[in-house]
Amino acid sequence: MLSEIDQKLLKIAYEEAKEGFEEGGCPIGSVLARDGKIIAQGRNQRVQKGDPIAHGEMDALRKAGRQKTYRDTVLYTSLSPCMMCSGTIVQFGITKVVIGENKSFGGNDEFIISRGVEVLIANDKNCIQLMSQFIKEKPELWLEDIAEDE
């Protein structure tokens, strides 16, 4: 069960995802927070910037800049993180990740859990609907984003 703060910050990650979708990109948004306060927020900008590493989580972390520590932060993401973003979560010692949905893409949740990260999966209907719409409307872009051929 998500706390009120978790729900609020996940909604902001969803809004970032929605904005990315409206820009013609992949609808994945993220928020990095400490003590319920936003440090930074971002969205997948692979298409917009032509940068294969510009995932939503990476965009938020870049915008956060250097932090003394990430061990007291929470990462909110509209979609389950890929292996690159999961590795970054572990590398920086982020202790909690709140995931909007892991139906469209998953598999790395267990990896970050095995590394001591608390993971909450919301199965948020808005996140699920947005990803479903994106995958239906732009299947080739989705396959490119997850590095699959078909």
Give residue ranges: language-model regions:
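Zinc-dependent deaminase
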Residues: M1-G20, R71, G87-E150
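Short, flexible loop/turn motifs enriched in small residues
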Residues: E23-P27
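Mobile, glycine- and charge-enriched loop segments
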Residues: E57, L61-L79
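Short beta-strand scaffold segments in enzyme catalytic cores
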Residues: I28-G36
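A short, polar/charged loop-to-alpha-helix boundary motif
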Residues: Q45-D59
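Short, thiol/selenol-centered motifs that function as redox-active sites or metal-ligating centers
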Residues: L75-I89
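Small-residue (primarily alanine) positions within well-ordered alpha-helices
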Residues: A13, A17-G20, S30, G56, ...
